[in-house]
């Protein structure tokens, strides 16, 4: 990684800087990127990810992907047992099958992890209500200023608020 301070035309090659992607290329970029980050998703979840495409545009993108074989339909089970249709990249299907036997080690997730970014989706899938409370007045916070969710295997099981003690470099 390198920071450069100069005029754009002196840093970015002209053929890259002047490229104007078509709407279809932009749509494909947004939908592909969203699905890559989410792993599996509905059209609405794809459209909500960047808030760049509409749900109907995402549905059309999904339909094209299903016809071409690039995407595959799957059913996911929500925390309440309800099934929902979602799509996954066909090439990712074998990897998903491999990773279903998830490690039970604990992971502390960032509040901005793609799995948590859409709070309603995370609550549906994991049955775990999570809200970041940095902008909530202290008296109204339920869990703390900057709380991290803890994942064990494929389940969100707890929250932790980590505070740094600057003088001793300890985490509390």
What are the language-model segments listed below?
Residues 1-107, 112-116, 121, 128-132, ...:
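Long, low-complexity intrinsically disordered regions
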